[in-house]
From Swiss-Prot:
It is an enzyme of class 7 (translocase). It is a multi-pass membrane protein. One of its GO terms (molecular function) is ATP binding. Belongs to the ABC transporter superfamily. Macrolide exporter (TC 3.A.1.122) family. It comes from Yersinia pestis. Keywords: Antibiotic resistance, ATP-binding, Cell inner membrane, Cell membrane, Membrane, Nucleotide-binding, Translocase, Transmembrane, Transmembrane helix, Transport. Homodimer. Part of the tripartite efflux system MacAB-TolC, which is composed of an inner membrane transporter, MacB, a periplasmic membrane fusion protein, MacA, and an outer membrane component, TolC. The complex forms a large protein conduit and can translocate molecules across both the inner and outer membranes. Interacts with MacA. SUPFAM superfamilies: P-loop containing nucleoside triphosphate hydrolases (SSF52540). This is Macrolide export ATP-binding/permease protein MacB 2. Part of the tripartite efflux system MacAB-TolC. MacB is a non-canonical ABC transporter that contains transmembrane domains (TMD), which form a pore in the inner membrane, and an ATP-binding domain (NBD), which is responsible for energy generation. Confers resistance against macrolides.
Length: 678
């Protein structure tokens, strides 16, 4: 292949100056630089330390902007472009080769080479194929999956060269490319750069070593920020002895690429691009992978960061589960009193000292209530405490005089025998239904109680049924209870004609509050005054639900504090991560990452930390619930899909909210400052 001819103007600087402010002083690093570079040239910029050569290279590569003057890249003026447009220029036209390689330690050689193509939106398989091809041609086919720490300096610089060529690399900017290499490796790198020049690339070498500069077609000397010489290489001078290596890259010349006056897409960019959503998915996939690698590289720190999120999420989910469990338990206890029931008592309220003297609740009131269309069933109630006897067994218990519908109203189940009937009530029959506690006390040896006669005080009654035990939070389920017809209790035991209370069960399709008003109105008319009060079980239920919800919310707010503390911990660690990975951010920006790409990278990492912490928090909460159920048989934590989904949503929001500032800080970094930071 013949050497390239000088092409059209590619890069041009007019009166470019660059100043930096240090404290109260202004330092001019470049002073009125006028320079034109044509496509296909191989140029060396040489100068001692402090001459401004690196600053000039940064301006050429759109990593920095001039303080004065103008700079053109293929007709475009970078200093008037936004950060994303500058990223596009770097991505599509420039390839950087750094003295210290600037490879990402967590990625393999192939993955390092692929980075520019990720930001260019190239298909995963296409960029992988391209990276393998580039590395194979520069002699690294056997080290595709090696990490930078497993490669020699020369091999790392070759990877850096392949990365510079990934998107085509119209202009290769090499900053001291042999500075950290031995002579043999340095000569190999120079051979590759010269070969790239022969292939049509514009190559700019920045060096302090004139022997390196002599390999270029054109040498530009800088001193104190000014060009003191711009000359072609002296062909009469003996060329340094080089190591002969084969041509490595086969790319169309720059003359072909800009013959129409506009930059054409490189070989890889000519391939069909993915649809917009798939490109975004690919970037998200790579960002996710990098987040995993970053977390894995700092396992202990990641675990400690997640600890606050784990505790916070576990606390919130557990508190909600405890709240729901306690609420369901209390509601079950209320239901044990009877569903949709109204309790009618004499007096104005519980604790009314005059209630004992009010004897206006009668069985006729119960009969009238039973005739109302909105009433499902009614049972009068009287009660007294007596001694229960059978044979030589004597225990204290409660005798309840009730109607035949009592067990239906209260939701009791008859485990043995039967309940008494309306006939038993009308005929004052001495039939009794006992509970399981009474059965166990009076008939401890498993003897059937049915048909047996027991003494309730001095009143003998025949046992016709056994009611199953019923858990209730409003009184102990260990009480001994016996139920007999209320007429029998009133006439043969108590000698009274008034009732202790009336329990009314309302039809399921009737609003309990309306039924309550109906009962109050009816009984007030019968009594001539309201000398009674009504307890609405729905009111109790609503009050307890509201109280439970309030307590759950209160404790949840305390748990949310843990989440906030965890979120602050995530933000702190992400800020540390941004500081530690400043150079990585600079490298990504140099190869074409937009500010949004950098922000997305760190946001995904923050969200991933929080989501993983949230998952572990939910798992911890479920484990707590399992242990809780082992130690508590009559109460359990109740988990809901809504609370778990909410936990994950909260985790994501914490990641976004507390990860936004560190991610924004990373995205707003100046690429050249990031690259220079040690």
């Amino acid at each position: 292949m013949t050497g390239p001819q000088q092409g059209k103007i590619l890069l041009r600087l007019e009166n470019v100056s660059r100043e930096f402010i240090t404290g109260e002083q202004t330092v001019r690093v470049l002073n009125n630089i006028n320079l034109t570079l044509h496509s296909g040239e191989m140029v060396a910029i040489v100068g001692t330390s402090g001459s401004g050569k690196s600053t000039l290279m940064n301006i050429l590569g759109c990593l920095d902007k001039p303080s004065a003057g103008e700079y053109w890249v293929a007709g475009r003026i970078p200093q008037y472009l936004g950060s994303d447009a500058l990223a596009e220029l770097r991505r599509e036209h420039f390839g950087f080769i750094f003295q210290r390689y600037h490879l990402l330690n967590d990625l393999s050689a192939r993955e390092n080479v692929e980075i520019p193509a990720i930001y260019a939106g190239i298909d995963r398989e296409e960029r992988r194929k391209r990276a393998v091809n580039l590395l194979s041609r520069i002699g690294l086919a056997e080290r595709l999956d090696y990490r930078p720490s497993q490669l020699s300096g020369g091999q790392q610089q070759r990877v850096s060269i392949a990365r510079a060529l990934m998107n085509g690399g119209d202009v290769i900017l090499a900053d001291e490319p042999t500075g950290a290499l031995d002579t043999h490796s340095g000569n190999e790198v120079l051979n590759i750069l010269k070969d790239l020049h022969q292939q049509g690339h514009t190559v700019v070498i920045v060096t302090h070593d004139m022997s390196i500069a002599e390999h270029a077609q054109r040498i530009i000397e800088l001193k104190d920020g000014e060009i003191i010489a711009d000359r072609p290489r002296d062909h009469a001078q003996e060329k340094p002895k080089m190591v002969d290596i084969p041509s490595v890259i086969d790319i169309p010349s720059m003359d072909e690429k800009i013959s129409t006056g506009a930059q054409q897409e490189t070989e890889i960019a000519r391939k069909p691009l993915l649809t917009r959503w798939k490109v975004q998915y690919d970037r998200l996939h790579e960002a996710f992978k990098m987040a995993i690698l970053a977390m894995a590289a700092q396992r202990l720190r990641t675990a400690l960061t997640m600890l606050g999120i784990i505790i916070g999420i576990a606390s919130v989910v557990s508190v909600v589960a405890l709240g729901k469990g306690s609420q369901q338990q209390v509601l079950a206890n209320i239901n044990a009193m009877g569903t949709s029931t109204l309790e009618i008592f004499p007096g104005k309220d519980f604790g009314d000292m005059r209630s004992a003297a009010i004897h206006t609740l009668r069985d006729t009131d119960a009969d009238v209530l039973a005739q109302q269309g909105y009433i499902h069933s009614v049972t009068p109630t009287v009660s007294t405490s007596v001694t229960l006897r059978y044979g030589n067994k004597s225990v204290s218990g409660t005798v309840n005089g009730v109607g035949e519908q009592y067990f239906l109203v209260r939701g009791y189940t008859i485990a043995q025998g039967m309940a008494f009937t309306r006939t038993s009530v009308n005929d004052l029959m001495q039939d009794a239904v006992i509970d399981e506690n009474t059965r166990d006390k009076l008939f401890p040896n498993g003897e059937t109680p049915l048909g047996k006669v027991i003494l309730l005080g001095s009143l003998p009654c025949r046992v016709i049924g056994v009611a199953a035990k019923k858990q209730s939070g409003f009184g102990s389920d260990e009480n001994l209870n016996v139920w007999i017809p209320y007429t029998t209790a009133m006439k043969r035991m108590l000698g009274q004609s008034y009732l202790k209370s009336i329990t009314v069960r309302v039809n399921d399709d009737i609003d309990l509050a309306n039924a309550e008003q109906g009962v109050i109105k009816l009984l007030s008319q019968r009594h001539g005054t309201q000398d009674f009060f009504v307890m609405n079980t729905d009111s109790i239920r609503q009050t307890i639900q509201a109280t439970t919800s309030t307590m759950t919310l209160l404790v949840s707010m305390i748990a949310v504090i843990s989440l906030i503390v965890g979120g602050i911990g995530v933000m702190n660690i992400m800020l540390v991560s941004v500081t530690e990975r400043t150079k990585e951010i600079g490298v990504r920006m140099a190869v074409g990452a937009r500010a949004s790409d950098i922000m997305q990278q760190f946001l995904i990492e923050a969200v991933l930390v929080c989501l993983l912490g949230g998952s572990l928090g939910v798992a911890l909460s479920l484990g707590i619930g399992l242990l809780f159920s082992l130690f508590s048989s009559n109460f359990s934590m109740v988990y809901s899909a809504a609370s778990i989904i909410t936990a994950f949503v909260c985790s994501s929001l914490i990641g976004v909210i507390f990860g936004f500032f560190p991610a924004k800080r990373a995205a707003e970094m100046d690429p050249i400052r990031a690259l220079e930071r040690e």
